């Protein structure tokens, strides 16, 4: 397995100013970085890809729908079309960057609720969007990994089983699921068993502790997580995802109101040391 870290620990938009951070990540021994793709031009992400190539860092990309005007499960077909266009753009950015994966909750706008559980129409619309995006992804050599969240952030997909069922419905080789241990800690009765049940559908893993701080400093049993991944033959990426207060808009979006670690660099150092002992 390769170990990576999500750049959301530092920023929502990676620019040339972050090259020293990327160099530090490489020096610490990370194999890859996860780049958030929320705004900007495709050409910019091609530049980011070249910086990472020069450093010898592989990359994945993360996404989210945040604008109600681009909602995969809106009753308005024009709004759903805008969501598909956004996901196509994110796939194009990943391809330009040389990233093999786009990961995230690609099924609804974050934090937007209807007051009820998912409807048949919403599930159908979300599957239609993914099926359409999968063709673009396949042509770009990109895999889409559906990220289940939790009931406080979404209503459509909160467990690995629901993500797996949805992937089966989409039925495309470029679509799979991912594990995020923070969300699983909230929603799964047994995270390790959920991983074993999802099995071959798992394409990506976020290592994130219960307080979004340093992995291993909280309550989650990462040993059980890694053993479950070993049991299904998973040999993909483990990406550290943590959030702090350095970027106010990210702190607000992730509801991080207190410091849970000394510094981002210290977290990155401690996280790779912690994960390396399991691999």
Where are these regions (language model features)?
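Histidine-acidic metal/acid-base catalytic patches
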Residues: 1-9, 15-27, 98-100, 157-179, ...
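N-terminal small/glycine-rich loop or linker at the start of catalytic domains
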Residues: 1-9, 61-74, 106-115
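Active-site-proximal loop/turn and secondary-structure-junction residues that shape catalytic pockets
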Residues: 9-11, 37-39, 65-68, 108-110, ...
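Catalytic domains of carbohydrate-active enzymes, especially glycoside hydrolases
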Residues: 19-39, 90, 96-98
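Glycine-rich, proline-tolerant flexible connector loops at the mouths of alpha/beta enzymes
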Residues: 32-55, 106-118
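Short amphipathic alpha-helices and their capping/turn segments at secondary-structure boundaries
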Residues: 39-56, 85-98, 127-135, 192-197, ...
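Active-site acidic/histidine proton-transfer and metal-coordination neighborhood
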Residues: 54, 77-176, 188, 258-266
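A short acidic, helix-capping loop that chelates divalent metal ions and anchors anionic groups
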Residues: 68-74, 110-116, 153, 186, ...
